[in-house]
């Protein structure tokens, strides 16, 4: 029997250079000996012999090898009138018998609706179509592989299932999508794979699956077929409470954590703990410290450990450094069952240049801009996403929803938003391209951020989004319908910079810089601010927070306690990076982590206890969290005593909540009988004193509290006399 395909066509199939092998392989109508028949063709380079088996009748028909490269064909007398029920039985070159089916007889996983939504860039469940999807077709189990590579000449699927020889597993194009697809019978969970892509110039390259759910431990780069739908969640109560939560009026004390260095384990690779161990340890620690949430530095797969996760190639895969996807699900689940929220850093601003990643994915500038003035980031040596392309926006927004849907994440903190908003960010004249109106605003990125926030808030009520945005861009945390970007919170970088600048001054000079503290209240309610003391403030030569404090040893600790006390009583949600709560001396090193051994010393244990107590005070007192974002919750009592470097203010909650009086003394000079005006008469109980002995202070304060004296002061009808501890904060609450 001679095939109706030419030898040159068969040779092209064997070489893997046919762009649409489904048009030649599988079942096709032919005219055989003057009548209609069906040709069944397969390409199995590793097969010695192949039989075609009818599933209904069990009829076994041998297929003829027509090319030594593994091209087999059988002619069936009956024409194609219904879907195939035939199977393949083959003996491979090792003598092993394998039962399978032809990849090219299986219908596409993509429906008309899928193709439409992908074309529009609005397929929110893209992760249920692209990548490696477990699938069963007519009783045959396998994996459906699909990848977006519109400018590729050909795409092969290679992996453990075919000895990394993709010639017999060439993907087929999905009409009008730029997607290539192939169902591989017998492929199964745990096998490694990649996509082998041929560019328009004929060059072959192996690429990671952008939608892969798991990957090998770096520096290895293959993806792993994974079923992410088997974990049994136990956090339904948490999710229901989250959906009903109002993030505007909820206490939020966030502990920022780098999982790779928070704690180490002996005998582990680089000391990395697994997700399950980390979950149990972090729950215990957060409970002890009264943190309400953890914020994880990026956990998506990244090749370079030194990037801390901010240069990802596996946006849909939790890093294998700490275990499997199911292990990370356990991490989130365990945190939720114990009342701790989980936020993650998410990096849609840029991606690395690693050859196996997204850059030049199909031989063209696919995910990035072709022009380096738009497509390369000068600071980080990374690529910038092309936010004007529907498919790229879809990839990123679906990724955000993926973490919320599949991993129950409670919030996304978007990294480097400022770099996304401005076309000239960190660029000189001539190094950037203006927008269509001649301006510097990145209009496509702005639309993307708005669409991202709309998608998150519409699909997952109660989930928060936070922007690390360091400019004066207006309306970052305002609703999109009001012209804003739609974030829940914005990091208050101005507060952070001004406050640390002030605290670095010797106390004797602080009277000349009081405006650095008071200025933040001029704009404090223009956005929904989070006050961050993040990892960025303790790296790259800046030193640790306590090392940035002036003075002798006692003053350094007192200044740090004062900094935290001022921060926790200032309007805004709170975020502290690990190590800050124990006053570690060295700046953060991702290889070493916090200096836990310092807790052998009373002074460091004192700072740790202070942070735990501040968290508790914020949680238990609505006045310190209910109106974080409105001026109704803040009132200056004394902002003008620069000479003594004293700041006094009132925090207020909802109607009926007792007000909180905060007195800060930014000098080492204690001040007795310091008169402070108050809005109501009664007893003001001291509920916190940063100079407490338990924290390492001198125990100078106002315990148990102060009674009003009936004397007007600070334009208030009554007043109290307080003792202001040196470099200290005292917090008082009206009891009656």
Curated annotation (Swiss-Prot):
Keywords: Carbohydrate metabolism, Glycogen biosynthesis, Glycogen metabolism, Glycosyltransferase, Transferase
Protein's name according to its UniProt entry: 1,4-alpha-glucan branching enzyme GlgB
Organism: Rhodopirellula baltica (strain DSM 10527 / NCIMB 13988 / SH1)
Keyword set includes Glycosyltransferase: yes
Family: Belongs to the glycosyl hydrolase 13 family. GlgB subfamily.
Xref: InterPro entries: A-amylase/branching_C, Branching_enzy, GlgB, GlgB_N, GlgB_N_E_set_prok, Glyco_hydro_13_cat_dom, Glyco_hydro_13_N, Glyco_hydro_b
Record's catalysed reaction(s): Transfers a segment of a (1->4)-alpha-D-glucan chain to a primary hydroxy group in a similar glucan chain
Active-site residues (renumbered): 415, 468
Chain's role: Catalyzes the formation of the alpha-1,6-glucosidic linkages in glycogen by scission of a 1,4-alpha-linked oligosaccharide from growing alpha-1,4-glucan chains and the subsequent attachment of the oligosaccharide to the alpha-1,6 position.
Gene that encodes the chain: glgB
Enzyme Commission number(s) from the entry: 2.4.1.18
């Amino acid at each position: 029997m001679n095939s109706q395909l030419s030898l040159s066509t068969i040779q092209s199939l064997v070489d893997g250079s046919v762009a649409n092998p489904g048009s030649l392989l599988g079942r096709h109508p032919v005219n055989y000996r003057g009548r209609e028949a069906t040709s069944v063709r397969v390409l199995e380079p590793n097969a010695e012999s192949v039989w075609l088996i009818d599933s209904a009748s069990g009829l076994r028909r041998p297929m003829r090898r027509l090319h030594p490269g593994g091209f087999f064909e059988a002619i069936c007398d009956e024409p194609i009138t219904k879907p195939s029920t035939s199977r393949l039985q083959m003996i491979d070159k090792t003598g092993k018998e394998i039962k399978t089916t032809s990849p090219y007889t299986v219908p596409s996983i993509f429906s008309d609706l899928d193709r439409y939504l992908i074309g529009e860039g609005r397929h929110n469940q893209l992760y249920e179509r692209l990548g490696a999807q477990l699938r069963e077709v007519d009783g045959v189990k396998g994996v459906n592989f699909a990848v977006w590579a519109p400018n590729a000449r050909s795409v092969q699927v290679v992996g453990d299932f075919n000895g990394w020889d993709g010639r017999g597993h060439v993907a087929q194009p999905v009409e009008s999508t730029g997607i290539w697809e192939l169902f591989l019978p017998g492929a199964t969970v745990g096998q490694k794979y990649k996509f082998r892509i041929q560019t328009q110039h004929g060059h072959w390259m192996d690429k990671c699956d952008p939608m892969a759910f798991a990957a090998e431990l770096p520096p290895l780069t293959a993806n792993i077929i994974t079923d992410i739908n088997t974990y049994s969640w136990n956090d339904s109560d948490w999710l229901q409470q989250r959906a009903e939560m109002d993030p505007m009026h909820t206490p939020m004390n966030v502990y920022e954590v780098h999982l790779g260095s928070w704690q180490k384990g002996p005998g582990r690779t680089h000391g990395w703990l697994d997700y399950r161990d980390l979950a149990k340890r972090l729950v215990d620690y957060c409970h002890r410290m009264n943190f309400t949430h953890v914020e994880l530095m990026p956990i998506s797969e990244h090749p370079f450990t030194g990037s801390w996760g901010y240069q990802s190639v596996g946006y849909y895969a939790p890093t294998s450094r700490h275990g499997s996807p199911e292990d990370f699900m356990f991490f989130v689940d365990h945190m939720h069952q114990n009342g701790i929220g989980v936020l993650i850093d998410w990096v849609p601003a840029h991606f690395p240049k690693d050859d196996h990643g997204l850059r030049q994915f199909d031989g063209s500038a696919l995910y990035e801009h072709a022009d380096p003035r738009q497509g390369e980031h000068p600071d980080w040596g990374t690529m910038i996403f092309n936010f004007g392309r529907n498919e790229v926006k879809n990839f990123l927004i679906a990724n955000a929803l993926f973490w919320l849907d599949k991993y129950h994440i409670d919030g996304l903190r978007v990294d480097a938003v400022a770099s996304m908003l401005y076309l000239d960010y960190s660029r000189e004249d001539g190094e950037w391209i203006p927008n269509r109106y001649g301006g510097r605003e990145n209009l496509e990125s702005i639309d993307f951020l708005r669409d991202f926030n709309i998608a998150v808030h519409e699909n997952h009520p109660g989930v928060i989004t936070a922007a690390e945005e360091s400019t004066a861009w207006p309306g970052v945390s305002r609703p999109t319908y009001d012209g804003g970007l739609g974030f829940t919170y914005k990091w208050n970088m101005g507060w952070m910079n001004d406050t640390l600048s002030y605290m670095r001054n010797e106390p004797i000079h602080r009277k000349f810089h009081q405006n650095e503290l008071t200025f933040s209240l001029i704009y404090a309610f223009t956005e929904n601010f989070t006050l961050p003391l993040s990892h960025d403030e303790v790296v790259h030569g800046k030193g640790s927070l306590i090392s940035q404090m002036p003075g002798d040893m006692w003053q350094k600790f007192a200044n740090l306690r004062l900094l935290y006390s001022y921060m926790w009583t200032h309007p805004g949600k709170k975020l502290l990076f690990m190590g800050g709560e124990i006053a570690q001396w060295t700046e953060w090193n991702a290889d070493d982590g916090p200096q836990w051994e310092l807790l052998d010393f009373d002074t460091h244990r004192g700072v740790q206890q202070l942070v735990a107590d501040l968290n508790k005070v914020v949680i238990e007192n609505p006045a310190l969290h209910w109106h974080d974002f409105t001026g109704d919750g803040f009132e200056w009592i004394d902002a003008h005593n620069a000479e003594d470097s004293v700041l006094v203010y009132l925090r207020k909650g909802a109607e009926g909540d007792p007000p909180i009086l905060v007195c800060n003394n930014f000098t080492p000079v204690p001040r007795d009988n310091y008169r402070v005006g108050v809005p109501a008469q009664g007893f003001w109980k001291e509920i916190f004193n940063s100079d407490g002995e338990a924290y390492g202070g001198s125990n100078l304060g106002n315990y148990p509290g102060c009674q009003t004296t009936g004397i007007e002061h600070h334009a208030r009808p009554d007043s109290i006399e307080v003792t202001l501890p040196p470099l200290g904060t005292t917090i008082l609450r009206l009891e009656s």
